[in-house]
């Protein structure tokens, strides 16, 4: 079995790519290139109701503008439905999933009220069902999703954030892997995709740390080898909240339209990760020799209007 390093960039066309996305992509790309590995690109467009027309093409153009190249063809999730269906069938056969007819309001009313910022934990209302019960529900015309049975919560060592342990039984509980609309949920799709694409290292934002134990359970249930994970801090505004419209227009398309050079933005992001002494123009490929995951600050990078003005963007 090959031990070659393979990383990935996985933009979602549910909206435009912004400076925060660019920083995470840069770290992921450098991690793979500095390790002598390859980089794959996947368009995560499985959440079709939220997809913005033209956003996928724009995301790829933004990656090229940043100087982040990739290997092989671009993978698009909406062309891979048979792979996800096969994975679901495997989970059914080993009784790791069950049909769930609960609506969001059902769950909210049945579950104990979470503390601020916490996820509602599924109370297990439909957990008594087996995969074979789906046929009767279909005959009765009852819509249902498929939930994965959470029996334990695997700990993992994050390449950046260190040891992680999340008790899924009290932080979400049994989770959806297939939506009632007939499409795979994020957790199942990314596991199937990363395994099929040969991804060995996933570098992404630390807001996705809670997703990792769920994905590790899926890897185990499907008999797949999981990649290594590195979750890096996000980019936030001056108020400490993750980038949004309230912080002004931080879309890469807006920076490009304003005449910002890609080297200027890459230099700013490289400086924010500790690879440069000051935010000076530099190409992404010139940072490969300077890349060190451990130099990235543990706290989120605060993007201010002053920093944007310094690279020629008034917002």
Specify the residue positions occupied by each region the protein language model found.
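A general structural signal for well-ordered secondary-structure junctions
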Residues: 69, 97-98, 116, 120, ...
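Active-site cores that bind ATP or allylic diphosphates and position pyrophosphate for catalysis
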Residues: 105-245, 251-256, 305-315
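Short, surface-exposed, polar/charged, turn-prone segments marking secondary-structure boundaries
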Residues: 35-37, 67-70, 103, 174-176, ...
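Short, surface-exposed acidic
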Residues: 71-73, 226-229, 276-282
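Alpha-helix initiation and N-capping motif
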Residues: 56, 81, 104-107, 119, ...
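Short, structured secondary-structure boundary patches
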Residues: 58-66, 92-96, 116-126, 248-254, ...
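N-terminal Rossmann-like or analogous alpha/beta NTP/dinucleotide-binding catalytic cores
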Residues: 1-115, 206-224
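Non-catalytic terminal extensions that flank enzyme cores
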Residues: 1-16, 34, 39, 134-136, ...
């Amino acid at each position: 079995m090959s031990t070659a390093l393979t990383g990935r960039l996985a933009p979602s066309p549910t909206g435009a790519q912004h400076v925060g996305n660019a920083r995470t992509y840069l770290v992921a790309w450098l991690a793979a290139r500095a390790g002598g590995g390859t980089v794959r690109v996947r368009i995560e467009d499985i959440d079709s109701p939220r997809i913005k027309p033209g956003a996928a093409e724009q995301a790829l153009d933004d990656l090229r503008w940043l100087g982040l190249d990739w290997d092989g063809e671009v993978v698009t999730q909406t062309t891979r439905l048979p792979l996800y269906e096969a994975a679901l069938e495997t989970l059914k056969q080993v009784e790791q999933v069950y049909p769930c007819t609960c609506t969001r309001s059902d769950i909210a009313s049945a579950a104990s009220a979470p503390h601020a910022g916490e996820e509602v934990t599924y109370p297990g209302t439909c957990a008594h069902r087996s995969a074979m019960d789906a046929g009767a529900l279909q005959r009765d015309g009852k819509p249902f999703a498929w939930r994965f049975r959470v029996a334990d919560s695997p700990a993992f060592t994050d390449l950046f954030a260190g040891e992680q342990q999340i008790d899924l039984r009290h932080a979400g509980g049994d989770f959806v892997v297939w939506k009632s609309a007939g499409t795979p949920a994020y957790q199942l799709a990314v596991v199937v995709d990363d395994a099929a694409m040969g991804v060995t290292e996933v570098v992404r934002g630390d807001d996705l740390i809670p997703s990792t134990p769920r994905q590790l359970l899926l890897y185990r249930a499907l008999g797949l080898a999981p990649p290594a994970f590195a979750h890096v801090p996000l980019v936030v505004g001056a108020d400490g909240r993750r980038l949004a419209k309230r912080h002004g227009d931080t879309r890469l398309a807006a920076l490009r339209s304003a005449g910002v050079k890609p080297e200027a933005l890459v230099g700013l992001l490289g400086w924010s990760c500790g690879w440069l002494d000051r935010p000076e123009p530099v190409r992404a490929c010139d940072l490969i020799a300077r890349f060190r995951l451990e130099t990235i600050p543990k706290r989120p990078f605060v993007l201010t209007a002053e920093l944007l003005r310094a690279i020629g963007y008034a917002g």
